[in-house]
UniProtKB/Swiss-Prot annotation:
It holds the Pfam family Citrate_synt. One of its GO terms (molecular function) is citrate (Si)-synthase activity. It is an enzyme of class 2 (transferase). The gene is gltA. InterPro entries: Citrate_synth-like_lrg_a-sub (IPR016142), Citrate_synth-like_sm_a-sub (IPR016143), Citrate_synthase (IPR002020), Citrate_synthase_AS (IPR019810), Citrate_synthase_bac-typ (IPR024176), Citrate_synthase_sf (IPR036969), Citrate_synthase_typ-I (IPR010953). This is Citrate synthase. Belongs to the citrate synthase family. It catalyses: oxaloacetate + acetyl-CoA + H2O = citrate + CoA + H(+). One of its GO terms (cellular component) is cytoplasm.
């Protein structure tokens, strides 16, 4: 359903003038005040740094209730999707709005699988990077470069081209991610295999070598598939908003997704699991936790508790519970069940959930708390953590971009500002300046 105007209005009083603003209701969640005509009526802008109280669009894709700890894709709880489905099923759901039938699922899987190869010239493109280039730098460049190789799917006004571009990115970005990893460690690229499932194929491309057979570990493949599901979309976050605002200009889909990857690279967005892992390593052992907690509580200390709390969730992150279970399974399978980091993580979580200081501040474990340990146990270096995030989030970005393109109300993004700089002044010739 689209947003509906309610009978309610909000009245803004400025001096002796009143402005009635419509209130719209969605299917669930907070109502919104429509300020679209406020500037024309009053000459006033609204001020909301970080857009924390601003709805920039209508969307039918993902719903979050941060107070209740709820995350739903197209109405389905994330717990049910992670427990019962696979990543490509979630991709279909996000793109089309409903879970696929068996026939639709097979057709969709086949289409993705047969798009995993990238143009052979991409291998030469990679050779232009330094071997020590960060994989995320390589990802931003290589995903943007897809538009040069697949210009038959860059017309955003053609629904067929939009869908082909969507299939290509879901399929090829994992291949590019694996290539970025292989390039940085000096190993040859590994071609995708059509006989493997999505997560299996990614593990194969990352860890197989030509000189010996690589056997897919089903526990690791299942865990990675679930990690992809958990990270597939998360409403209007920084990178998704970046994709939408880039797309609002009419940019091609490959450029828009590259913009999203660039935003995700920021440590405040995609690098949270790296920070959580570094924190656990710094603590080192369980006996050091009380000292660490004391520093966290000290206002004069710069020590911060990473992997706890969330910009949106004011309750337990529903993804964290699933990730915790997967973390244990992966560590057991890889022989890292006694990993000191896990012991520190478990004790730190126990203390944080029972300590009134953290309860009052609603600092609950988030998805990043356990994901770093899990990915490390799988064999991925820290530099690849955000790359895997990008692989998972690609389908969310594409779904949001497609929704924006089809939205008749969508306009080019143009935030306004509160100017606080110097007021008008006249030019002074350089010889007369002091």
């Amino acid at each position: 359903m689209d947003a509906k105007a309610s009978n309610k209005t909000a009245t803004l009083t400025v001096g002796n003038k009143n402005y009635d603003l419509p209130i719209h209701s969605g299917s669930v969640g907070p109502d919104v005040i429509d300020i679209g005509k406020l500037y024309g009526q009053s000459g006033l802008f609204t001020y909301d740094p970080g857009f924390t109280s601003t709805a920039s669009c209508q969307s039918k894709i993902t719903y979050i209730d941060g107070d209740a700890g709820v995350l739903e894709y197209r109405g389905y709880p994330i717990e049910q999707l992670a427990e019962n489905g696979d990543f490509l099923e979630t991709c279909y759901l996000l793109l089309y709005g409903n879970l696929p039938t068996a026939a639709q699922k097979k057709d969709f899987d086949d289409r993705v699988i047969h798009h995993t190869m990238v143009h052979e010239q991409m291998a030469r493109f990679f050779q232009g990077f330094r071997r020590d280039a960060h994989p995320m730098a390589v990802m931003v460049a290589s995903v943007g470069a897809l538009a040069a190789f697949y210009h038959d799917s860059t017309d955003i006004n053609d629904p067929k081209q939009r869908m082909i571009a969507s299939m290509r990115m879901i399929a090829k970005i994992p291949t590019l991610a694996a290539m970025a990893y292989k390039y940085t460690i000096g190993q040859p690229f590994v071609y995708p295999k059509n006989s493997l499932k999505f997560a299996e194929n990614f593990l194969h491309m990352c860890f197989a070598v030509p000189c010996e057979e690589y056997k897919i570990n089903p526990v690791l493949a299942d865990a990675l598939d679930k990690i992809f599901i958990l990270h597939a979309d998360h409403e209007q976050n920084a990178s998704t908003s970046t994709v939408r605002i880039a797309g609002s200009s009419g940019a091609n889909p490959f450029a828009c997704i590259a913009a999203g990857i660039a935003c995700l690279w920021g440590p405040a967005h995609g690098g949270a699991n790296e920070a959580a892992l570094a924190m656990l390593a710094e603590i080192g052992s369980v006996d050091k936790i009380p000292e660490f907690i004391a520093k966290v509580k000290d206002k004069n200390s710069e020590v911060r508790l990473m992997g706890f709390g969330h910009r949106v969730y004011k309750n337990y992150d529903p993804r964290a519970k699933i990730m915790q279970k997967m973390c244990h399974a992966v560590l057991k399978e890889t022989g890292h069940g006694d990993d000191p980091m896990l012991k520190v993580a478990m004790e730190l979580e126990k203390i944080a959930l029972s300590d009134q200081y953290f309860i009052d501040r609603k600092l609950y474990p988030n998805v990043d708390f356990y994901s770093g340990i899990t990915l490390k146990a799988m064999g991925f270096p820290v530099s690849m953590f955000t790359v895997l995030f990008a692989v998972a989030r690609t389908v969310g970005w594409i779904s949001q971009w497609s929704e924006m393109i089809e939205d008749p109300q969508q306009k080019i993004g143009r935030p306004r500002q509160l100017y606080t700089g110097v007021t008008r002044r006249d030019y002074v010739a350089i010889k007369d300046r002091k």
